[in-house]
Amino acid sequence: MANSYQIIDEKAWERAMHCAVFRNSVEPAFCVTFEADITNFRLMVKEEGLSFTLAMVYAVCKCANHIEAFRYRFVDGQVALYNKIDTAFTYLNEDTGLFKVVNVPMLDDMKEYCELAAKTAKEQKVYFTGPLGNDVFSDNLWKN
């Protein structure tokens, strides 16, 4: 799923100081937790016959892609800005009770994404396809 990116000139970059602080972190990640009223979203997903979980992965990652700061990564020690970030999510294998990590490219259409994600998750036989790529979002959804 290798997406294209551009290398950032850190000398002229307004985020250079912040980058220097976190550059050597074990996992320089950005985590956000928030409450959201998803009543209308749930209704729409149900009407469309989509998986709630896959639709939410799509929606969160679609929004995150619109925020430039969330698309920065380190590539070979340099700061890179990706044109887009794909998705990675966990999916429970109901036969074994074990989860697998599924990588799915981000698409423009939610229904197409959900169909591809469901197909990919169902057909993927291995639990891990390798280390997570540098160009993915992974969200953890909690619904009350």
Write out the residue ranges for each language-model feature:
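Gly/Ser/Thr-rich phosphate-binding loops and adjoining beta-strand/alpha-helix segments
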Residues: 3-8, 23-55, 73-85, 144
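Basic, often amphipathic N-terminal segments
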Residues: 13-18, 23
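Generic structural motif
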Residues: 37-41, 63, 92-96
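Structural preference for long, well-ordered alpha-helical segments in enzyme cores
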Residues: 57-63
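Short alpha-helical functional segments enriched in proximate histidine and acidic residues
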Residues: 63-70
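Small-residue-rich loop/turn and linker elements
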Residues: 70-103
